């Protein structure tokens, strides 16, 4: 082969390689190390996980009780503080088929003083057991919702008594002792989730093992501002 033809062939091969180089540069999801490191089989999943995502995806409204250890407590004293907010949480599913059991979200809190805060988060489902994880973007704090626990678990799905899809239960901090309790009702399905609901009928499905709502047995703290999350 002549030098000229070889140069032309190499140039053509380089040109053909450009699209592959571009398409291989997709941003990795925030949780890739956590996801693949702890759950290597999460790509092998069934239709139940798809149904969970279809139910979870959407806009939810309700109440949140956030419990944490008071940073301003006296030395040696561990004082637990519980604050209640009106909350709206919107879950968007990933449009990437590889990450179809995960997504992003926005949370808007309002306290009894009328103050509001908006928080971005990412979420994913452990398809082996149905646990839901939420990671707040600003603090990188991860909370887990345990699908198997009857005391600190969750319910996600249709609730006949309310004639609505509801989502209530505990989020437990994985790197601190913070706890969040939510009691939400779905008010809207975003367009990103509609395609999934068309192919995955929601019906009267429910997930998680919690069936009873939590009732506070003490007076909630009147919140001034918001504890960092």
Task: Locate predicted features.
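Tryptophan-anchored aromatic micro-motifs
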Residues: 39-80, 125, 218, 224
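Short, solvent-exposed mixed-charge patches
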Residues: 227-229
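N-terminal glycine/threonine-rich, aromatic-flanked beta-hairpin/loop signature
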Residues: 72-129
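Sec-dependent bacterial lipoprotein signal peptides
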Residues: 1-25
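Short, hydrophobic/aromatic-rich segments at coil-to-beta transitions
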Residues: 55-61, 98-104, 127-134, 162-170
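Bacterial Sec-dependent N-terminal signal peptides
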Residues: 18-56, 183-193, 201-203, 207-222
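Generic short beta-strand segments
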Residues: 61-70, 103-109, 136-140, 168-172
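Acidic, glycine-rich flexible loop segments
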Residues: 128-164
């Amino acid at each position: 082969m002549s030098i000229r033809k070889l140069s032309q062939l190499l140039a053509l091969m380089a040109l053909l390689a450009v699209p592959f180089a571009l398409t291989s540069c997709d941003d990795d999801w925030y949780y890739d190390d956590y996801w693949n490191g702890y759950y290597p089989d999460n790509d092998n999943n069934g239709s139940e996980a798809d149904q969970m995502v279809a139910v979870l995806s959407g806009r939810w409204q309700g109440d949140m009780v956030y419990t944490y250890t008071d940073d301003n407590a006296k030395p040696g004293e561990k004082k637990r503080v519980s604050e209640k907010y009106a909350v709206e949480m919107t879950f968007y599913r990933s449009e990437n088929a590889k990450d179809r059991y995960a997504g992003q979200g926005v949370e808007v809190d309002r306290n009894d003083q009328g103050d509001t805060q908006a928080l971005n988060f990412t979420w994913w489902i452990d398809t082996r057991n149905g646990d839901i994880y939420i990671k707040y973007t600003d603090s990188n704090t991860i909370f887990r919702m345990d699908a198997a626990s009857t005391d600190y678990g969750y319910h996600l799905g249709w609730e006949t008594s309310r004639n609505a899809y509801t989502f209530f239960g505990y989020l437990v901090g994985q790197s601190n002792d913070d706890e969040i309790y939510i009691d939400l009702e779905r008010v809207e399905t975003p367009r990103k989730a509609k395609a999934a609901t068309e192919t995955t009928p929601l019906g009267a499905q429910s997930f998680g093992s919690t069936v009873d709502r939590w009732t506070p047995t003490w007076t909630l703290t009147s919140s001034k501002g918001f504890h960092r999350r």
